[in-house]
A protein has these predicted regions:
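C-terminal recognition-helix end and immediately following basic linker
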Residues: 1-40
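Residue-level marker of structural boundaries
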Residues: 25-29, 290, 335-339
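Intrinsically disordered, low-complexity regulatory regions of eukaryotic transcription factors
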Residues: 35-58
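DnaQ-like (DEDDh/DEDDy) 3′-5′ exonuclease domain used for proofreading
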Residues: 55, 59-77
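Core catalytic lobe of class I
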Residues: 73-320, 324-327
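Class I S-adenosyl-L-methionine-dependent methyltransferase module
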Residues: 156, 208-210, 335-346
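Conserved SAM-binding loop
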Residues: 330-331
């Protein structure tokens, strides 16, 4: 009697009908094949010399040993660690110490067929999610308990990723009004989603990212007294006076910032298909920054926007990028950055 084996989970079936039913089910089976291949690969790797990888540090190519002790990204002798690493982010992050990074901002390929030069952005969804599991696991491992991990994406793709993340998650919307999808026959896309992930109570600098008040609030509510009402959030018999904060309203989870499209992004735009605005990158960094020694990791450096924003705010960062042209683009942009001097208001 012939045996039928699932190439993905390696489960064996004696009857073809059972095998067909297994292969056609909606929920994908566990990918034991890749797990087994990794085990074999690790066994082989431990028997040969450690591999070398190229690192681009301030436009200088050096070599780093994969077997070297885990590194800690920090300010050393008054100098910030600010570098772009040419190489795979998963392998790169494996070298970073556990619980040592304040902010991780991920703008991965969305698996929608974008051209990034030397890598494919079109995989089977199962393979794409398995790959996402790998880099997200490293991001979570290196993240401090009070740190924040941000992941960009379209909602319909991030929904699959979100359920696989085992720490706290909030949804943020980046809403842009100056860019729409070219289709005229369906809902026009005017937003991207951001997963905001954290282990424990995260650092959140609300006063650094306050937003302008709406005209409605300033006209109808500011300075007025509201009497107590019954309900879940009742404050008893107290009355509340609404006052406008000098720096604006508390930040909301819908961020309204223009995309780099048309005239709005002409001065900032570079040759990269998914470049994010510096204003957006800076907002995420300022919201989660944890003092002068803040450490940011950018697994997919791409156009370098997150790294440029980090350098402007004078924090430590490492960005990973596999495309040599984009490594050069990042370093070119970083070479033109002037650090912004922060003035503390007493």
């Amino acid at each position: 009697m012939p045996d039928y084996t699932c190439e993905r989970c390696l489960k064996e079936f004696s009857q073809k009908s059972h095998y067909d039913k297994h292969m056609n089910r909606k929920t994908p089976c566990q990918n034991n094949k890749k797990t087994l291949e990794k085990v074999v690969e690790n066994i082989i790797t431990n028997k040969i010399e450690p591999k070398k990888s190229e690192i681009t540090l301030k436009n200088t190519i050096t070599e780093t040993d994969h077997a070297s002790p885990k590194i800690e990204i920090a300010t050393k002798n008054g100098e910030k660690t600010q570098q772009i690493v040419k190489g795979d982010c998963i392998e790169g992050m494996k070298k970073i110490k556990d619980d040592s990074v304040d902010i991780v901002i991920c703008d991965p390929p969305y698996n929608i067929g974008k051209d990034f030069g030397n890598n494919s952005d079109r995989q089977k969804m199962d393979d794409y999610l398995v790959w996402c599991d790998e880099w997200i696991a490293e991001c979570i491992r290196i993240l401090k308990p009070a740190g924040t991990l941000y992941i960009y994406g379209f909602s319909e793709i991030l929904a699959f990723i979100r359920v696989r993340i085992n720490i706290n998650v909030r949804w943020i919307i980046w809403h842009y009004t100056n860019k729409v999808t070219p289709s005229l026959n369906f809902w026009q896309r005017t937003h991207e989603s951001i997963l905001c992930c954290y282990k424990e109570k995260p650092v959140f600098n609300k006063d650094d990212v306050r937003e302008p008040y709406t005209e409605t609030f300033l006209k109808n509510a500011a300075g007025k007294v509201r009497k107590a009402t019954k309900g879940r959030f009742s404050n008893g018999e107290k009355e509340t006076t609404y006052t406008a904060h000098a720096n604006g309203a508390l930040p909301r989870d819908v961020i309204k910032i223009s995309a780099l499209a048309g005239g709005a992004g002409k001065r900032e735009r570079v040759d990269h298909p998914t470049q994010k605005p510096l204003e957006l990158c800076a907002k995420l960094i300022k919201a989660s920054k944890n003092g002068a020694d803040t450490v940011l990791v950018v697994p997919f450096a791409g156009s370098g926007s997150e790294c440029v924003a980090a350098k402007k705010h004078n924090i430590n960062f490492i960005g990973y990028e596999i495309n040599e042209d984009y490594v050069k683009l990042c370093n070119d942009r970083l070479s033109e950055v002037e650090v912004e001097v922060e003035v503390e208001v007493e």
